[in-house]
């Protein structure tokens, strides 16, 4: 799995974000100015925005370390995670693992592709994100014996897994707050409480990265 896609999967699994919230993330949506040890992801567009304004996702140290390399040298409106970056990573890995020298024709072909920067979209969408994960799983399974195959899963599975882990560790209310599950009226009333719970979860991840224990889906993220 390319590092870009791996970072997306891990952040979504840690925070319980919707797929659209992870692949729609822009550099300018990340607030690093609070001085409390947490960053905040404030999506520019959110389905409950008309009721409660900007929804905030507190980001602890594990998420910050995954995000940091993808914020460097980018403008505010640029995608944090881009298919273009993932494709460049795949090409670099393929080149590094290559056993034979490139032929002149292959060099010319690669140079021609470099001159087409818009061949890949800047942003993932729900189809390309799901397909990228499926491709990574299929690729990984080619090297694994049949009894160790990674089962197919979708981006929404990561969100559900995050909520399940939170419910088992802390409670149902905290899991609902992590996902933002409330009616429109209830969301307005409980938005501040949800943010406090999300901050608590982020601070817990500051102390202990759940991936250190081996989370579901981690094999596919390698």
Spans of model-derived segments:
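C-terminal catalytic core of Y-nucleophile DNA break-rejoin enzymes
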Residues: 47-135
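Short, polar N-cap/turn motifs at the start of nucleic acid-interacting alpha helices
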Residues: 28-37, 142, 151-152, 170-191, ...
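Short helix/loop segment immediately N-terminal to the Walker
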Residues: 103-105, 109, 113, 140-152
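Basic, Lys/Arg- and aromatic-enriched nucleic-acid-binding interface segment
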Residues: 1-23, 35, 73, 87, ...
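Catalytic-site neighborhood detector that most strongly recognizes the C-terminal catalytic loop/helix
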Residues: 45-49, 87, 172, 179-204
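C-terminal secondary-structure termini that scaffold catalytic or DNA-interacting sites
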Residues: 85, 113, 185-188, 200-222
